[in-house]
Amino acid sequence: MTTERTDVWRGSIRIIELTMLWGAFLQLGLRAAQNTAASPPQAPQTLSTPSRIDPKAQPLLDGVIRALGGPAFLRFKTMTTRGRVYAIEDETTAGLAPYVSAVEYPDKRRFSYGKKQPVTLINNGDQAWELDRYGQTSQRPEQVYRWKVSTRYSMENLLRLRIHEPSVLIQPGGVDFVDNVPTQGLDITEPGGTHVRLDLNRQTFLPVRITYRVQNPTTREWDEFSDVYGDYQNVQGIMTPMHLTRYLNDERVSETYRNSARYDEDYPAGYFQPTG
């Protein structure tokens, strides 16, 4: 083969190679454009603002956690109590019944009350049932509303979950007297305006009262709940209130007297379902 023909042949090969390479680039570019068009643009990730704690409030938070049992209080998962519950209407006892309560935090409970033919209330997140001798039914909306609000701001969930949620503001509050007990307040404000006040015993740092103001989803009016805790006893290293009184809009609506309490008991599978 002559040198001239060889050069021509090599030039042809290079042209073919460049053409194939350019075609590959075009194909890759087309695929990238198709993928870009098929996939919607991703929104930039935003970091949640952590809770904001006033430096003067931090010692109060540390004190109440320590008083309640420190790590033992922070780590337990279930609580089983037995005792008596009073329903109160117009400051008159409307009902009295023995009860058994099983709670798996943060939002599951099985609450049975009554003697011969007990009624059982089961809550599992947004699901809520009532079981009695006639069978199974759904809890009334007002029951569900009160349960969800009261468990969200219970002493356990407030101090283990709520105060750590994004954008929560925690500040020291004023001093007060609750049931003749001198208290120091902590003001907790959630995004959206819900305000919670935690009153601590000034000597022991144990919670005496939790007050929370929540907008009723049905009436759109603001309801003020107040839970008063007393008669603390050491149970498995955790200071446990054995007497609880609940107020709604300044009216006493229930009282609970616990005879016994146990932590971290195991419950059967499906215990927080109506078939459990």
Where are each of the predicted segments found?
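Signal peptide processing junction and immediate N-terminal pro/mature segment
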Residues: F25-Q42
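Short, conserved active-site entrance elements at the starts or edges of catalytic domains
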Residues: S150-D187, P207-T211
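Acidic/charged, solvent-exposed loop-and-adjacent secondary-structure segments enriched in E/D, K/R, S/T
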Residues: W129-N157
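Gly/Pro-enriched, hydrophobic low-complexity segments
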Residues: Q117, D179-T275
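N-terminal mature ectodomain segment of secretory-pathway/periplasmic proteins
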Residues: Q45, S51-I53, Q58-T137, L169-G174
